[in-house]
């Protein structure tokens, strides 16, 4: 069986050159990117990684990839990350893994952003996947109520144990469901006006290259 995620994830490593500062995304596809980068580092590649989550940080450390915090780098040469959805206008939803705030901060500091996806992540309109909102625990119910007044349905994200999911930053996540984001710019502006929302999962002006792996194993490169 063809592993689309592995194909897309490993393909992105072709953009990595010696001496680069590399943003390391979070998720099941970029997992394979990081595994491949670990092999390349062990074979003599010199890079510095900037992790977008504790999960990625641990994986990179175990593979021997040198790491720095975002505070300790001036800029990032290239960031490789996954996506939950992306449309033909290069607008995406991220944050299914809960790392949206750090992912967006790293993406913003990057000269180039590559997203690695399998073909079902390419959509005509955003919204099949829930849109995550990272909210502070203090008063999160107020955020939920404000959205309800706008007829926006949300679910508080929970772990499989039933406990509330807590991000690496100590925050909660509200997932907007049953919504289509045809005017993503409007949504971005709307959400920015609600106190308590730390960040949202709309990534509108970040990605430069999409590496899409198809079911037959072929790779499609989509560039701006």
Swiss-Prot record:
It catalyses: aldehydo-D-ribose 5-phosphate = D-ribulose 5-phosphate. Catalyzes the reversible conversion of ribose-5-phosphate to ribulose 5-phosphate. This is Ribose-5-phosphate isomerase A. InterPro entries: NagB/RpiA_transferase-like, Ribose-5P_isomerase, Ribose5P_isomerase_typA_subgr, Ribose5P_isomerase_type_A. It is an enzyme of class 5 (isomerase). Pathway: Carbohydrate degradation; pentose phosphate pathway; D-ribose 5-phosphate from D-ribulose 5-phosphate (non-oxidative stage): step 1/1. The keyword Isomerase applies. The active site is at 103 (proton acceptor).
């Amino acid at each position: 069986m063809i592993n689309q995620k592995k194909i897309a994830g490993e393909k992105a490593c072709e953009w990595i050159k010696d001496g680069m500062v590399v943003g390391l995304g979070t998720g099941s596809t970029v997992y394979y990117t990081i595994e491949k980068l670990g092999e390349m580092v062990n074979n003599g590649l010199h890079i510095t990684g900037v992790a977008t989550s504790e999960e990625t940080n641990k994986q990179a450390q175990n593979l021997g990839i040198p790491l720095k915090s975002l505070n300790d780098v001036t800029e990032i040469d290239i960031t490789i990350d996954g996506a939950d959805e992306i449309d033909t206008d290069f607008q995406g939803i991220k944050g299914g893994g809960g790392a949206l705030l750090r992912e967006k901060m790293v993406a913003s500091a990057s000269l180039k952003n590559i997203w690695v996806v399998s073909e079902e992540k390419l959509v005509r309109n955003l919204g099949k996947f829930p849109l995550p909102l990272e909210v502070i625990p203090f008063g999160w119910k107020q955020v939920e109520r404000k959205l309800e007044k706008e007829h926006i349905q949300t679910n508080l994200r929970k772990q499989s144990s039933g406990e509330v999911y807590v991000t690496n930053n100590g925050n909660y996540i509200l997932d907007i469901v049953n919504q289509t984001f045809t005017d993503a710019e409007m949504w971005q502006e709307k959400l920015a006006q609600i106190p308590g929302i730390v960040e949202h999962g709309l990534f509108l002006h970040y990605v430069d290259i999409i590496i899409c792996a198809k079911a037959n194993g072929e790779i499609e490169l989509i560039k701006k």
